[in-house]
From Swiss-Prot:
InterPro entries: Aminotrans_V_dom, Aminotrans_V_PyrdxlP_BS, Cys_deSase_IscS, Cysteine_dSase, PyrdxlP-dep_Trfase, PyrdxlP-dep_Trfase_major, PyrdxlP-dep_Trfase_small. GO terms for cellular component: L-cysteine desulfurase complex. Pyridoxal 5'-phosphate binds at residues 75-76, 155, 183, 203-205, 243. This is Cysteine desulfurase IscS. GO terms for molecular function: 2 iron, 2 sulfur cluster binding; cysteine desulfurase activity; metal ion binding; pyridoxal phosphate binding. It comes from Aeromonas salmonicida (strain A449). The gene is iscS. It is found in: Cytoplasm. The active site is at 328 (cysteine persulfide intermediate).
Length: 404
């Protein structure tokens, strides 16, 4: 077993060796290095063929038509293209958008930008388990609502929203539905027909593919129109200009092919490991799980250890690669906005750790992690005056702290 142990698969995954192998064949003179848009020679045709195959592989995992797949530089761009693209194209119909407070920053900040442009955005608040009710969404719909954007699986707490029901509602009201499926695709079944989504963002690097490549599913029937956000040579049916990076697209295709084949067995393996981890730490005193445990993706475990500072715990767990909050915002010392939206107080939000398991996680690593967590929590709490007060029966919410 090698240290440190990687338990941060929700931040990124290592590239699967089979994917890396395929990518290597698209880079050098003796490989498929051509520009897929070069129509006048074999180098271009071969590259185009490789891109077409990958487009089919991505479409197959999503239950989509390959013509509905638009390649982008990643899910951040996919989210921007979907939300701004729809908002700008349908501005004549209305300027109201609905999303949630627990979305990824790539959705929230895109909506903030649209607010600066004169659009109105409603931010829904989740229930304490991280889920939304259909009534909440229905109650927020207006005559001028043009788009609802809700993530399938949350990146911090791993809860799975009932997208099919939301899709049904939006379809009946003729409102477009965009779904950020970065954390669900390849982990749980995602079928764009069953979910009734109009736009769906995916990324390769959360599915053991390379970073820097993603895709946006854009429905053809009923047809969804977008205003391009990147202008140039008119690639990707005019929706996203820029030379297609053959090696990255091929890598994404292979990653999605493997995911389709291995998702069921891999899900069981990861679920068993997560259960092993939770069973190993759940009897520690004052430990709380964040988000619904039933409606949850297999690899995610988000836990708050009361009376332990999250940052100091991460330092104590230096042999484990874990995070507090998401990687995208972990540089800030603010408590997780996702956990705050669930109603957690600052202290509990600050003491949360996200463990995310994946394809290459082993039982041996989980057992090592359990021992390390138990030892570290015990040691850190011994040093904590708050823990001492809690053990003495002091209700810490009633304590008046002096401000100097």
């Amino acid at each position: 077993m090698k240290l440190p142990i990687y338990l941060d698969y929700s931040a990124t995954c290592p590239v699967d060796p089979r994917v890396a192998e395929k990518m290597m064949q698209c880079l050098t003179m003796d490989g498929l290095f051509g520009n897929p848009a070069s129509r006048s020679h074999r180098f271009g045709w071969q590259a185009e063929e490789a891109v077409d195959l990958a487009r089919n592989q991505v479409a197959e995992l999503l239950g989509a038509d390959p013509r509905e797949i638009v390649f982008t530089s990643g899910a951040t761009e996919s989210n921007n293209l979907a939300i701004k693209g729809v908002a700008h194209f349908y501005a004549g119909k209305g300027k109201h958008i609905i999303t949630s407070k627990t979305e990824h920053k790539a959705v929230l900040d895109t909506c903030r930008q649209l607010e600066r442009e004169g659009y109105e955005v409603t931010y829904l608040e989740p229930m304490p388990n991280g889920l939304f009710t259909l009534e909440q969404i229905e109650g927020a719909l207006r005559d001028d609502t043009i788009l609802v954007s809700i993530m399938h699986v949350n990146n911090e707490i791993g809860v799975v929203q009932n997208i099919a029901a939301i899709g049904e509602l939006c379809r009946s009201r003729k409102i477009l539905l965009h779904v950020d499926a970065v954390q669900s695709v390849g982990k749980i079944p995602v079928d764009v027909e069953a979910l009734k989504v109009d736009l769906l963002s995916v990324s390769a690097h959360k599915v053991y593919g390379p970073k820097g490549i993603g895709a946006l599913f854009v429905r053809r029937k009923p047809r969804v129109r977008l205003e391009a956000q990147m202008h140039g040579g008119g690639h990707e049916r005019g929706m996203r200009s820029g030379t297609l990076p053959t090696h990255q697209i091929v890598g994404m295709g292979e990653a999605f092919r493997i995911a389709k084949e291995e998702m069921a067995s891999e899900g069981q393996h990861i679920m068993a490991l997560r259960q092993r981890l939770w069973d190993g730490i759940k009897d520690i005193e004052a430990v709380y799980i964040n988000g619904d445990l039933e409606q949850r993706v297999p690899g995610n475990l988000n836990v708050s250890f009361a009376y332990v500072e999250g940052e100091s715990l991460i330092m104590a767990l230096k042999d484990l690669a874990v995070s507090s909050g998401s990687a995208c915002t972990s540089a800030s010392l603010e408590p997780s906005y996702v956990l705050r939206a669930l109603g957690l107080n600052d202290e509990l939000a600050h003491s949360s750790i996200r463990f995310s398991l994946g394809r290459f996680t082993t039982e041996e690593e989980i057992d090592y992690a359990i021992k390390l967590i138990r030892d570290s929590i015990g040691r850190l709490r011994e040093m904590s005056p708050l823990w001492e007060m809690y053990k003495d029966g002091v209700d810490l919410n009633t304590v008046e702290w002096a401000h100097h």
